[in-house]
């Protein structure tokens, strides 16, 4: 069995292009690990590879979920497990690529078996979050999970809301579930991960250019189609990078210029958070700072050859 190659990195760092070239070189297949690229309605806004870019390389778990659904990490993990089993039977290389670190952690470290939160509790916590903010959530969570409430402070409203809704639904701390992880799909020795860490200044400029290109390529039309469906703004697809700003423009709440600047700013902030995540969650993954695909290929094959000697000829 060939070890799977995992590619992670911040938004706009060139993950998809690299994954496609790796899969093409190895005769392998690409598996998506980006939580927004699973949605069929977000071709442009999620920067999902186009049909032309994917040509000749089989791709999996891209654009197959409706934006009206809450698609969980557990659902993705089971879908990825199915694809990986088939590729292993066929002795094919798997290149798993995406900016959703939680997906990659679940794949390689296991996933906590947290029961689904009922919609009425989700709605209750959402109302608290909107009316009382992170301060209110922290105060409500503190009596039940003081350690997590202290660690999160008021800087992560989404995680505070998640921890509080889990406690309301189960009466247990989120950390209890996290300490009861299922066995990972990919065990030690069955995968190797690489983190793309291009220079930040250049990356931020690329983020700005890419978003400007998205506006030209149909991002507004995608947002308009979703706004017309009156979907819950708290759905994951409606919170994709750039979507809230473009949706506000579609509704006439802000100008096109304001939408563009807001989306660019949030994308840069998100990239910064992804760099932080990589440092904390993947401290031992080899870093590849070069933005050039050829350099990245050489680094990956040099290391990959040490654990898998088949089909890893030099990339020139």
Swiss-Prot record:
Single Gene Ontology BP annotation: tRNA modification
Catalytic activity, as annotated: adenosine(37) in tRNA + dimethylallyl diphosphate = N(6)-dimethylallyladenosine(37) in tRNA + diphosphate
EC number, as in UniProt: 2.5.1.75
Pfam family for this entry, one: IPPT
GO molecular function, one term: ATP binding
Enzyme class: transferase
Family statement drawn from the similarity comment of this UniProt entry: Belongs to the IPP transferase family.
Oligomer status and interactors: Monomer.
NCBIfam families the record matches: miaA
Function according to Swiss-Prot or TrEMBL: Catalyzes the transfer of a dimethylallyl group onto the adenine at position 37 in tRNAs that read codons beginning with uridine, leading to the formation of N6-(dimethylallyl)adenosine (i(6)A).
Protein name per its UniProtKB record: tRNA dimethylallyltransferase
Organism classification: Bacteria, Pseudomonadati, Pseudomonadota, Alphaproteobacteria, Hyphomonadales
